[in-house]
Structures are given as C-alpha cells and as structure tokens.
Amino acid sequence: MSEAATATLAVPVNERDHVMGPANAPVIVVNYGDYQCPGCQQRHRSTEKMARELLDSVRLVHRHFPLVKSHPHALRAAEAAEAAASQGKFWEMHRLLFLRPDKLRDRDLRGYAKEIRLDLETFDREMASGIYADRILKDFYFSLNHGITGTPTTFINGVRYAQSGVELVATVKAIVEEQVAKRLQ
C-alpha cells in the first residue's frame, strides 16, 4: 500500500455533500474535483469502476474545486451539477460532465439537463440566477485554506492520498479488505 500524506480531511462528510453508497460503508472516499481537469476525468473513471466493484463497501463523496483561472467552464459546470442535484440527479449530471469535458458551455449544460430529463424551466432559472456559484466558491476558498491546492485531491477515511487512479482503487480495495476483516473478528 502506498504511503499516505499527513493531511487529513478538514470537513467531515455532511448533509451538503454529494454522496453515493451506504452510510455504514467501511470506506469513505472524498474526491475534490474540477470538471475540466484531465486528472479528475481519469480519477472519475477509476472511482466509477471502483463504485461498481465495491458497491456495498464504499461511500463516494464529490466536492467541487473549480480551478477557474485555468478552467473557464469549471464553475458553470459545477453550478449545473448543483442544479441537477436540486432535482435529485447530481450523479447523472456529474457523469456527463466528466464524459464530455470539452463541451461545458451553457448550451451544452442545458442539453445535458434535457438529456437527464431535468425540469428545464427550473434548471434555466437556477443557472441564470447563479444561486449555486457563491456556495461553490466559498467551499473552494475554505478548502484552499485547509490544504487543498489542486485537483484531483482524494481522501480515504479522512486521510489524503496522492496516487494515480489505478493505485487509488488498489488502496481502497486493500482498506475495504482490512475493514471487513476487522468487522469479522
């Protein structure tokens, strides 16, 4: 198992987070990501595969960390994900945004909203109002002040890991096996 960095997760998983997986999962993976970040796209593919393989043992959490200076569409994409979340479809939008990182202009985001069958009137109103931008940016600056400096950044059970997607999946599998063994003792 690769050595973990000493950094720990500043904010525990809470009701504001986007979560997939059982509440009692022995392993919690928190990803900080940006929809235009190539590394995040690779990490998304790895964690999506991991979620399918370890469905009952892992809880996935996504937190926005849009690097707006280098990724001009990342904030709007995060807003679209939040607008989808308000209609119960965060993960559907999240997946599309990572699958199509070169198509994140407003017209593209609206097309994705239509594709996942969001109420377009509500989506359009929320996107026009910018109601999610302030929260996303506040979370970004809070995270920045607590040691998150780039993407992708991943924490497993509260400890920061700096690994490639493949290595990360192997680490999570090892931690799941370790946690399951502890429960059986």
Question: How should each PLM-predicted stretch be described?
Answer:
Residues 11-12, 42, 135:
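Short secondary-structure boundary/capping elements
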Residues 8, 13-15, 122, 156:
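Residue-level signal for pocket-adjacent positions within structured domains
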Residues 1-10, 185:
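N-terminal targeting signals for export/organelle localization
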Residues 30-114, 119, 175, 179-185:
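Structural alpha/beta surface segment adjacent to cysteine/selenocysteine redox centers
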Residues 26, 34, 151:
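Residues immediately within or flanking Cys/His clusters that coordinate Zn2+
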Residues 19-20, 104, 161:
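Short clusters of hydrophobic/aromatic residues that line enzyme substrate/ligand-binding pockets
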Residues 45-49, 111-185:
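C-terminal cap of thioredoxin/glutaredoxin-like
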Residues 10-27, 52:
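A short beta-strand-turn-helix
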